[in-house]
């Protein structure tokens, strides 16, 4: 067997390639901790300018178990003619300090939006396989998937760790609706967004993917993230069956 000799720097100096590797590790560590855990966002939902409900997005950690929750509820006056009661949960496991958040373990989506009902679950198994369960229609199927794949909820947290440059799309592999998607996320431009706490610099993104939940989307989805290392989602806008829904960050802990 041929022995490969290592590179040696001058005495007392660190070889350049080692410095490059160390810098890369530090960058990865910074990205992995780019947002806080626990973290919770609270949103006010408006429909054509009128308050229509509330939504939350939360992530917690106990040991190596990571849990992400997303909820949306319609206001009382909206529920009279269109009830919204959505809850999405994702469970991940932390296996390496250099991982963005963790590897998906379980994903459960339960939504009620008017007459639209969904209760489905995805179990991420070993060996690059997932089990899809439709709890309403009593359906269960197994699928082969790539090794690095996310559910719709954990994919958003992965997105927040990526470098976002205007005009340069990023891609995320995701399992949803019994299919593997290579989702393109367009990075559109930088904008200022006014919140109850003041004006913040943001970067506007547009995922080219229509997932279920959060007022059953009918059109494009736009998300405004703070233009800093935390990438806090401060605003969301999407078309629905009638009109559009805006979600604006109004509280939480982050």
Positions of PLM-derived features:
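Acidic, serine/threonine-rich low-complexity disordered tracts
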Residues: 33-126, 161-254
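Exposed, low-complexity/repetitive linear segments and helix-based recognition motifs
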Residues: 27-30, 100, 148
